[in-house]
Amino acid sequence: MAPFVPYHNSAGQSKIVKFGGLLTTEFLEPPPGRCFLFRQTYRHNVEGPIPDNLRKLINSPDRPKGPPPHFHQFQTEYFRVESGVMGINVDGQVKRVTAADGEVSVKAGSVHNFFIHPDSEESMTVYLSASDSGMDYQLDRIFFENWYGYWHDALLHDGGLDWIQFLAIQDGGDAYTPAPAWVPFRRQVGYWTCVIVGRWIGGLLGYKPFFREYTTDWDFAVAKMKGSFFQRHLVHDAYAAEKNWDAQVALEAASRPENAEFEPWVQDMSPKALVLPPVQYEKGVFVDGAARATLSGVNGHANGVNGHAGVNGHATNGTNGTTTGAEWEDVVALKKRVANGANGVNGTNGVH
C-alpha cells in the first residue's frame, strides 16, 4: 500500500474526539518529571444518528476499546482512574482498576494494554502520563495526536491498519508491538521489527511517524524526524518561511491595484516605419524660417570649408569646397547633387 494520507485535521486542539465520541482525549499540562498528561474517556456506545461506517465499526470486533498490546522500551506509564472501571493486562495478568486504587504504574519493558472494562456502566475516564526519557522518540503529545488520528482514519476510511504505517507511528512513540508469546525473545523481536520495518524500511518507502494534520507542535515533530537518517528526507522546511495572515495582508497593500486579468496579455513588438516630414529649403533656409547656412559661407552647403560640396562634403572636387568659386547655383540643382552624394572630399572622387 502507498503511504497514508490523513482524512481530517485535528492539530491545535487540546480536546480531540474520535469515532464519533467513542474516544475523547483532553491534553493537560504534565507535572514535573512526566512528558505528557491527558484525560481520556472511552464509551461503550454512541447515542444518536451516526454514519453507517461508524455503526459498522462499533458493532465489529475491532471497535476501539483500548490500544493493542504493546510495551515501552524506555518509559514507565502511569494510570489513574477518575470514573468507571478500567481493565489492564500486564504481562498476561488482567487487573480491574477503579478510582479507589489510586495511581498504578506499568514499568518499562512490560507488555500491557488497557481497556474499558465490561463492568463500566457507560464510560471509563482515566488520566494517563509517563516518565520523561529525554529521547527523540518517546510517549508524548505528538505521538498520541498521531496515533489516535491515524487509528480513527484507518478504521473508518481505510478498512483497517496498514502494518508498515502502524509500526512507523508506534516506533515514533516508544511503543512497540511484541511478537507472539510463543516466540523466544518476543520483546527484542518486536522492538527490532518496529525499528527495521517501521523506521528504516518504512522511512525509505515514504512512511512518516508524524503528520502535520494531526500534530500541534509541528516544529518539534520535524526535529524528531530530522534525527533519523531514514526519515529526514520526508521533512520539508518551507513551512517555517510562510508568513502569517497579517503579514500577507501587509504585502497585499503594497502590490499593484490592478488584477492580473486586466493586464495586457501581449505587447505589440512588430516594427513600424519611421515617418518623417519632407524637408523643404528656400535659398538655404528651412520653410519654418530656421536659418541654416548660406550656399557659399563657411560651413555652408556649397562652397565653404567643410560644406557639403567642399572638404567632407558630397559633391565637388575642390579641397576646401569650391564648387565654382563665386557662382550661385540653383537650389534645386544643389539638392540633387547633395542627394546623389558625388565627388566631394570623403565623397567618391574628392580628397579623403
UniProtKB/Swiss-Prot annotation:
What does the UniProt keyword field contain? Oxidoreductase
- N-terminal signal peptide: none
**EC number(s) recorded for this UniProt protein:** 1.-.-.-
Q: Name one GO molecular function term.
A: oxidoreductase activity
The pathway this protein participates in, as annotated, is: Secondary metabolite biosynthesis
Kindly report, in one word, the top-level EC class recorded for this enzyme. Answer: oxidoreductase
**What is its biological role?**
Oxidoreductase; part of the gene cluster that mediates the biosynthesis of aculins. The pathway begins with the synthesis of 6-methylsalicylic acid by the polyketide synthase (PKS) acuA via condensation of acetate and malonate units. The 6-methylsalicylic acid decarboxylase acuB then catalyzes the decarboxylation of 6-methylsalicylic acid to yield m-cresol (also known as 3-methylphenol). These first reactions occur in the cytosol.
Describe the family membership recorded for this protein in Swiss-Prot or TrEMBL: Belongs to the oxidoreductase OpS7 family.
Protein name in the entry? Oxidoreductase acuE
What species is given as this protein's source? Aspergillus aculeatus (strain ATCC 16872 / CBS 172.66 / WB 5094)
